[in-house]
């Protein structure tokens, strides 16, 4: 007796099923990933249960998953010889959304079996993804250890109900036949199915097989007979996960080949880290540092992240939740035993487990970079040339690791007058003068502009090293990285130089004397430039240049203003502080000028020169040229 019955889905919500079928997954081909994953689950369940009762194997312990297509009938079939289902479990588990036999099975495991289990079907709705491409789904199954006549047929069109019927099934396990919708017949193609299996299920430990047609006897090119070959089931996936093997058993060549496989990069990786984490969270990570920056590294619309596997089954590319944005160049994967996922597996749940994994993986990458910088400085310089600007985003994004990130940064400096960015903050501190308590830096549009800035004159004279920053992100960086190892970073173009103990008494006395003698000059310049500057004062930083402009404490620097303007952000009105060098011949000439109009023109000319030196451009270059020509003509008359 067939005992055919019709049941309504226990959720009793046809609309929910339809919504899930059409909206839950972001691409249709995922149906095969889900069904192959379920089949692998069934094999794993049988493997574990057979440890204590090997009669469940029924004389066949070669577990496998098989996928086949029939173009004429428009069907795709996925079968396994795993644990199978009884009639009751079919009704319970295939009749309820978000109910999973695997999850229930998993909760009953304990000890080492639980740790090593590769049961991935804790999501409850994977089976129903079949209806994304199928107008009808037929399931034939028999539980291991049960008689052949205890097989079950389950069939549904995904319309809110399903039929269940008892059948005879000689082989244990489950066979799922998808009757494809007319518009989805592309999936009834062996090549299409092979490509999906390779993409999503390459590293499932259970062999995934497809039928390889035999060939008839034929004539060779020289007339010889070529023997016929028989058709056979051929394994499509590697059926091994490299990252689950012992590190000592994996060669460098294997690591590099695997990197190329997952990254689609043609060149070798620079470095990698393969690590197994056990404890509260259990996962394996295999992280690669590329040798070259990917072409899309600066594309903010493109997702960057790690491949995510759960129990060796590919879940998604570009899982962004496990690394901060400033490490978006890292390639690799994570394979979790207990990672919580949303039911669709498409969106990771943002919770404490995910956060803890992110913290651990971030520390792992930073540790890898620190080791590279220490042990292979030349290799690290190659890395820095490719990814340094991205790493500079770190202090703003990752407060907890700010000090570690700062230790990885490299800059040009006045130490060797080279444009090469090879100087670490650690090395700078080691070379600091006795009594120096600040790390001095300058940010400019180019290395040349930074290296030749008049703001460096006194510091060069005293032999004080200055970091030369000239990348667009540098101003953003120093706004978030204000100190390193208790040494404050101090801009030489902002406020006072604050030399502290580096300023000897004789210099200070000389400066104070010049400032006192120049009070009248300062007042005249203030009056002449009242609309253009916020303050005029005697400089303490210039030795060879007549004047310069600096930003006041708490005011935006020139570079930050440029950044804001480039981003289309409103910039508050501000006027610079104008510093003059009374010992310079041009300023002495200015001081001796009795004609107030000429005095104002000279003062304005010096200001425009200082602004040009600082900004690289002027708001009104034509007016500056006119003024310059006017002063030149006056001097030759």
UniProtKB/Swiss-Prot annotation:
Chain intervals for the UniProt region annotation (B):
346-562
Region annotated A, chain positions: 1-345
Region (C) location: 563-637
Its cellular-component GO annotations read: cytoplasm
Q: Which GO terms describe its molecular function?
A: ATP binding; ATP hydrolysis activity; ATP-dependent protein folding chaperone; unfolded protein binding
Pfam families assigned to the protein according to its UniProt record, in alphabetical order: HATPase_c_3, HSP90
Where does this polypeptide localize?
Cytoplasm
Checking Gene3D superfamilies in the record gives: 3.30.230.80, 3.40.50.11260, Heat shock protein 90, C-terminal domain, Histidine kinase-like ATPase, C-terminal domain
> Any idea which UniProt keywords this protein has?
ATP-binding, Chaperone, Cytoplasm, Nucleotide-binding, Stress response
Q: Which InterPro entries match?
A: HATPase_C_sf (IPR036890), Heat_shock_protein_90_CS (IPR019805), HSP90_C (IPR037196), Hsp90_fam (IPR001404), Hsp90_N (IPR020575), Ribosomal_Su5_D2-typ_SF (IPR020568)
Q: Which SUPFAM superfamilies match?
A: ATPase domain of HSP90 chaperone/DNA topoisomerase II/histidine kinase (SSF55874), HSP90 C-terminal domain (SSF110942), Ribosomal protein S5 domain 2-like (SSF54211)
Functionally, this protein is described as follows: Molecular chaperone. Has ATPase activity.
Q: Which family does it belong to?
A: Belongs to the heat shock protein 90 family.
Q: How does it assemble?
A: Homodimer.
PANTHER family tied to this protein = HEAT SHOCK PROTEIN 90 FAMILY MEMBER
Its recorded name reads Chaperone protein HtpG
Q: Which gene encodes it?
A: htpG
